[in-house]
Amino acid sequence: MSIFSSRRQFLKSLGLAAGAAAAGNALPGKAVEIPAGDHLWKSASPAAPRPSGSTYMGGFKAPRLGRIRLAFIGVGGRGFSHLAQMCVMDGVEIVGICDLKEELTKRGVDRVLSRMGKSPLGYSGGDMEYLTMLKELKPDAVIISTDWSSHARIACDSMKHGAHAFVEVPLAVSLEELWSLVDTSEATRKHCMMMENVNYGRDELMFLNMVRQGVIGDLLHGEAAYIHCLVTQLGDTRGEGAWRPEYHTRINGNLYPTHGLGPVAQYMNLERGEDRFCRVAAFASPALGRNAYAKKHLPADHRWNNTPFICGDMNTAVVKTQLGRTILVQLDETSPRPYSRANLIQGTEGTLAGFPTRVAGEKLGNGNYHEWIEGREKLAAIYEKYDHPLWKRIGELATKMGGHGGMDFVMLSRIVECLRNGEPMDQNVYEGASWSSLLPLTARSIAQGGMPVEFPDFTRGDWKTTMPLAVVS
């Protein structure tokens, strides 16, 4: 079939599309459908038993794929970056690209043709056009880089059409959506992996390796954050600025928990045999910074000068695990301060921390844990001894390829390796659901005055049988 059709051109005007990329392409001024209030957490009750015929997906090994027929849904900034990196992967054939905007679909098609010598089919139009692509091409796997509100719907549809789903962060917004992803993955026996790229950063991989080797003893406490001033998005009409600020007007909670939480959760083996998330209590500061920015930098009649923001500028939550460990999780996308994900893990014999990278412990350096080992020269010996085998193997190439310092390339390489070798994914659907659930759970806790709220057990008790993530080479 032709890349574009008159029907697709007509559909282009009908609504917010599957192609609104994580850094990409929602329609300017088009409202995003955002669940709010108790709609975020209405499926927080204990899970029903797993339906007959469904499969627990922790450690699941799908049949090997000698060649991966891959499709993309959403190729704005984030999706196009994934597309460009997948063009150099062995064993990958990019068969389809879908985006709301015809020009972005064409850009993706042209990139694949120039790099791989074969043109994928392009789809563009309304927000359900991706279904046409799934039905016609039947891809093995799909990479989804759309606005948050469409993640769950598109991923579930992809799995129902026989494709493994790889989804940008967060996996979904509401507990109901997260349960639908878990249930669909189990029913279809298809991987549903949230692509938490930060877990593949050099420091995060090294800390995982050090924790697995027992360098800091028994784990006690972690700290995770997403501190990133994004207020300038209020002046944007394309990309994330077209839809992401809307969440700050609808939800008072941690809107973006997984970048900081994902690595800490895997250090602690949460939902993987050793420990699990139990409850969280959250609090929010006043929401002042965005209205102040809009008043200072935008016209008086601009929508953001006539819309109240409710998401506190700083969101602080404390997570308690079944073993009694604690995790501090913070979000601030508004205040003028340097970027940080915290990335701290503390044990009985030492502490590893990020931003800046620094370590201290009884088994590190000369054992003087009253001072940090930090700075390029002092950390050189730590990297030499503890760099993760995966980073040693492909870190140099990943750094050259770019993508958040190489973490994107390492993540995509592992996805390809796992699919081609029939290995379990490094991040299973239950981890993606648990990490993403901080969004609705912190909103619920804040709405209830900071009362602790329980985490759903997305594994239905089977986390106890799931192996910890190995230090793969």
Swiss-Prot record:
Cofactor section: NAD(+)
UniProt superkingdom: Bacteria
Pfam families cross-referenced by the UniProt entry: GFO_IDH_MocA, Glyco_hydro_109_C
Binding residues for substrate: 226, 244, 256-259, 339
Keyword NAD: yes
PROSITE patterns named among the record's database cross-references: TAT
Keywords: Glycosidase, Hydrolase, NAD, Signal
Membrane spanning residue stretches: none
Free-text comment on the cofactor: Binds 1 NAD(+) per subunit. The NAD(+) cannot dissociate.
EC number: 3.2.1.-
Range of residues in the leader sequence: 1-31
Entry-linked PANTHER family: BCDNA.GH03377, GLYCOSYL HYDROLASE FAMILY 109 PROTEIN
The family this protein is said to belong to: Belongs to the Gfo/Idh/MocA family. Glycosyl hydrolase 109 subfamily.
Function description: Glycosidase.
Protein name stated in the entry: Glycosyl hydrolase family 109 protein 2
UniProt organism field: Akkermansia muciniphila (strain ATCC BAA-835 / DSM 22959 / JCM 33894 / BCRC 81048 / CCUG 64013 / CIP 107961 / Muc)
